Amino acid sequence: MVKVIASSVRKGNVLEVDGKLYVVLTAQNFHPGKGTPVTQIDMRRIVDGVKVSERWRTTEQVERAFVEDVNHQFLYEDGEGFHFMNPENYDQIVVDVETMGDQKAYLQEGMTCVISMYEGVALALDLPRHVTLEIMETEPVVKGQTASSSYKPAMLSNGIRTLVPPHINAGTRVVIATEDNSYVERAKD
């Protein structure tokens, strides 16, 4: 275990609090006008999946567990969960639906992800920063509509809705940021 200050904790880190391990879901630093800056951390207990919210002063020390980040390739999904393979030794692991969370929408066969492992158990999953998806449907552009926002809603091939520029139409392949579902650019393929 390593002691770190609360403000340096990030999503996906594993913390030990009161002898139990937690995976960080969100970590936000707040600097109120008066008073001490604090870090609000939402976590999930690894043993039973209970979600907990903690608030620490940004300079407080918290214990971070050592986790191993290992590249894995996504194979398939079934009733057990999501199956991944380590390309170095061909070991396969199953990641449950709760650990995957909302990220499952971006998984594509053969995609390489970084899985955080603690004593052989998958705790968190990091997708590539950008994925290429196809626009399934989008609204038509209204000419001369310059007073409002220049982005329009669109439905992606994985079922997620996002905003795209007016020149993007259905059938176009685009690059999307997995962190916030935002449009990055038109795909170059």
UniProtKB/Swiss-Prot annotation:
GO biological processes: peptide biosynthetic process
Keywords: Cytoplasm, Elongation factor, Protein biosynthesis
Annotated GO MF terms: translation elongation factor activity
GO cellular component annotations of the record: cytoplasm
Pfam families with a match to the protein in the record: EFP, EFP_N, Elong-fact-P_C
SMART domains xrefs: EFP (SM01185), Elong-fact-P_C (SM00841)
Family matches, as InterPro entries: Elong-fact-P_C, NA-bd_OB-fold, Rib_uL2_dom2, Transl_elong_fac_P/YeiP, Transl_elong_KOW-like, Transl_elong_P/YeiP_cen, Transl_elong_P/YeiP_CS, Transl_elongation_fac_P
Primary localisation category: cytoplasm
Compartmental location: Cytoplasm
Gene3D superfamilies cross-referenced by the UniProt entry: 2.30.30.30, Nucleic acid-binding proteins
Source domain of life: Bacteria
Pathway stated in the Swiss-Prot or TrEMBL entry: Protein biosynthesis; polypeptide chain elongation
Family listed: Belongs to the elongation factor P family.
Biological function: Involved in peptide bond synthesis. Stimulates efficient translation and peptide-bond synthesis on native or reconstituted 70S ribosomes in vitro. Probably functions indirectly by altering the affinity of the ribosome for aminoacyl-tRNA, thus increasing their reactivity as acceptors for peptidyl transferase.
Protein name listed in UniProt: Elongation factor P
Lineage: Bacteria, Pseudomonadati, Pseudomonadota, Alphaproteobacteria, Hyphomicrobiales
Protein's gene: efp
